[in-house]
Each structure stands twice: as C-alpha cells, then as structure tokens.
C-alpha cells in the first residue's frame, strides 16, 4: 500500500507574542489569547518565503530517508502565498533538491488545504504507477492586515511529505474530500491582505467541512474515535481544532501531540501537515491517525493513516523534530515584525 515514505518540516525561528501586537493596537492581550488560544506565532525572516520554506522542508525529509531525488516524479506545492504570481514554486524546489528533468510539477491553491490536495494527487499517481515517489508540500507565509484579527494568528512554516510504495512509514489507508462554495475568507488578485467573514468562518465553514469529512471517513473505515491513537485537524487557532475534536468524541490525549498552533500560529497550508509531522515524530508502529485539513472557500481533505514498523528503522532525529523547532526561538518586537513582513512602505531606493 502507498503512503508516507519520509517527511520534513520547517518553522522560522523568529516569534512574536500576541501581547506585543495587542500593545501596539491598544487591545486587551488576555482577551486575545483567551479568544484564540495562541501564545506566540512564527515570523519569516526577510530572506524567507514559501520557496525557501518548501526547500528546507523537502531537504529535511530527504535527511530522514536517503531517496535518490531523481526518483521523485512529481512535486506539488500548496500555498496561498507563493512568491511569484507567474513562476512556479515547485520547479524551484525541484532544482534545489536535484530532481530529474522528467517531472510532473505544479503549484496548488485552495486556501489552507492546497498541500493536502497535493498529497492526494501524488498518492493517486503512485497508485496508478505513473511515478515511484511524489513530493507534496504545504507551506505559507500568511498575511494579516495591520490591526486585523488575523494578525494575531497568521504565521509562517511548512511541511513536506514524500509518498511512495517502498519502505512506507505510514500507510494512507483511505482519503476523501468535501467541498462547497462558502465565502468565508478571500483575497482578490493584487490585494495585499485577505478579507474574512469573522464568525462566519466557524460553523458554516470550518466546522461544517472538518466535522463532516471526519464523520464520512469514520463511516467509510467503519471506525469510531476510540479506534484512533491520534487525531489532527487544520489549526486556524488553538480553539477550533480542540472544539472539533470534542464534537466528534475525541479526547485531549488524542489531539494534544498534533496541536502546535498555540506555539507557532496558523501556518495556513502548512498547518495540518505540520501537526501530522509532530505526530509522526512521536508515533510508534500500529498507531492509527485521523487527519483532516481545511481550506476556506471551502473544503476539507481527510486521511486515515496507519503507522508501520518501518518508522522504527528511521532515525527521526536526522532532521529537526517539531519539538526542536518549537524550542528554537528568537523573539522580535512589533517594529521588527512589521519590517520583516514588509508592512512598512518605504521610499524609493530604501531597503
């Protein structure tokens, strides 16, 4: 059966606390933290973007498993903050890791589930015999307008999964998707920051799609919440995924290892995939995982995954674990954050 052969993630070391953002805008920091359950968020350095994050995540995946890059037949990078409007991120990644000229490559967009859409496609291509290995990446340097609620959560990071049939560490038993035209979050071409429906992003968008996708997967697999060792959802904040887990009947011990948004914020396309990476860092053979992404607009991808004995053969410490990256922090204030995120409009010739 096809599944995850190796994985890697990258989280920028720069962080800012919601308290600092609240201080600048005259907001109550305790109200903000209690409302979204985010204690800090990652900030990309001036030389970090979706391309560099994707390359680092892919290289970390290759550190854990010595795969010949020329055997990777497809690369799909999901993001809503690709560095170029016209020039693919996927080819940059391919060149950086040394893939062959014969390559399926594309950039995907579906808000925060573009990366998991890539996972589904490379799995289908592997199953069809079109490629030996496929690389799916979800990464973002997400945007939030100054003073907007999104500024407290929009962060940066990403994860890469190489999918194949040989030496699989986590079998993807099944995957499915749900989608509907739900205008909960959007950004038109040329606009620097997205707009959102505030509370409308909850019940009719996130919870409708995530909860139903999870239920449909459990119905298909004839499973119940108690049959899973771990569950991970898309994490726009710290509260939505915990509420979704409880609505479905999961316990804290099942979702706590994959819940990383309270420490790094919402990495958008990297969110659920990085939570899954965190679970794979600590999982053992036989562990059963339910993973559900979400993308505004709106849709969810669900995965039923079983960890194999091969994971014990992998030296997971050959690349930074999520725990290690969470511990590697350099704090910045709002001025540095605004500078790094290019929120300050400079005069001509000033850098």
Curated annotation (Swiss-Prot):
Q: Which UniProt keywords apply?
A: Acyltransferase, Isoprene biosynthesis, Transferase
State where CoA binds. Answer: 199, 239
Q: Which reaction does it catalyse?
A: acetoacetyl-CoA + acetyl-CoA + H2O = (3S)-3-hydroxy-3-methylglutaryl-CoA + CoA + H(+)
Q: Which Gene3D superfamilies match?
A: 3.40.47.10
Q: Name one GO biological process term.
A: farnesyl diphosphate biosynthetic process, mevalonate pathway
Residues binding (3S)-3-hydroxy-3-methylglutaryl-CoA are 112, 153, 201, 234, 243, 266, 296
Q: Does the keyword Acyltransferase apply?
A: yes
Record keyword Magnesium present: no
Please name the pathway: Metabolic intermediate biosynthesis; (R)-mevalonate biosynthesis; (R)-mevalonate from acetyl-CoA: step 2/3
Active site residues per record: 80 (proton donor/acceptor), 112 (acyl-thioester intermediate), 234 (proton donor/acceptor)
Q: How does it assemble?
A: Interacts with acetoacetyl-CoA thiolase that catalyzes the precedent step in the pathway and with a DUF35 protein. The acetoacetyl-CoA thiolase/HMG-CoA synthase complex channels the intermediate via a fused CoA-binding site, which allows for efficient coupling of the endergonic thiolase reaction with the exergonic HMGCS reaction.
Tell me, what does this protein do in biology? Catalyzes the condensation of acetyl-CoA with acetoacetyl-CoA to form 3-hydroxy-3-methylglutaryl-CoA (HMG-CoA). Functions in the mevalonate (MVA) pathway leading to isopentenyl diphosphate (IPP), a key precursor for the biosynthesis of isoprenoid compounds that are building blocks of archaeal membrane lipids.
Family recorded in the similarity comment: Belongs to the thiolase-like superfamily. Archaeal HMG-CoA synthase family.
NCBIfam families, per the entry: HMG_CoA_syn_Arc, PRK04262.1
Name under which the protein is recorded: Hydroxymethylglutaryl-CoA synthase
Protein species of origin: Thermoplasma volcanium (strain ATCC 51530 / DSM 4299 / JCM 9571 / NBRC 15438 / GSS1)
